[in-house]
Amino acid sequence: MNGDMMDTNVIIKYLAGDISAKRLLDSSSEISVSVIVVGELQYGAQKSTRSKSNLELFANFLSNFSIVPVDENIAKIYGEVKDQLRKKGINIPENDIWIAATAKSRQSRLLTYDAHFRSVDDLEVVS
C-alpha cells in the first residue's frame, strides 16, 4: 500500500470546513493527489466568480501534497478499468476513471465521497 489519494470532492469539502472531510484527512498519514484532480480544481476555480482567490486557495492547499502525474503504467490501467466497467455496463466520468487508475497504480486507497468508485475492481475506497 502506498498511502492515500484524494478525490476532488474531498478537497472541496475540506476547504469548505466539512468535519467529515477533516476527519478523513486527519486519519491518513501519507496523502497524494492525481494531476487529474488538479485539473478539476483548476477548472472549478476558473469558472467561479472568485477565480483568483480560489486559484490561490487550491494552490496553497495542494502545495502540501505530492502531485502524481499520468504515466504509461497509469494509462494501461486506465484502459483496463474502462474495459472492466464497460463489461459491467457501468458508466462513470472519464476523469474519475483516470483518478481510479492513478490510485490503483500506486496501490493507494482513494478518499472520495463518490460511490461509483466502488464499482472499480481492486480499488479500496474510503469515505
Label every model-predicted segment.
Residues 67-111:
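Active-site neighborhoods of divalent-metal-dependent phosphate/nucleic-acid chemistry enzymes
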Residues 11, 38-41, 75, 117-118:
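A generic structural signal for short hydrophobic patches within well-formed alpha-helices
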Residues 7-8, 41, 78, 103:
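Generic structural signal for small/hydrophobic residues in well-ordered secondary structure
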Residues 22-26, 117-122:
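Short loop/helix-cap segments at secondary-structure boundaries that form the rim of catalytic
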Residues 15-18, 112-116:
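Short, polar loop motifs at secondary-structure junctions
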Residues 1-33, 43-60:
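Short, well-structured N-terminal submotif of metal-dependent ribonuclease cores
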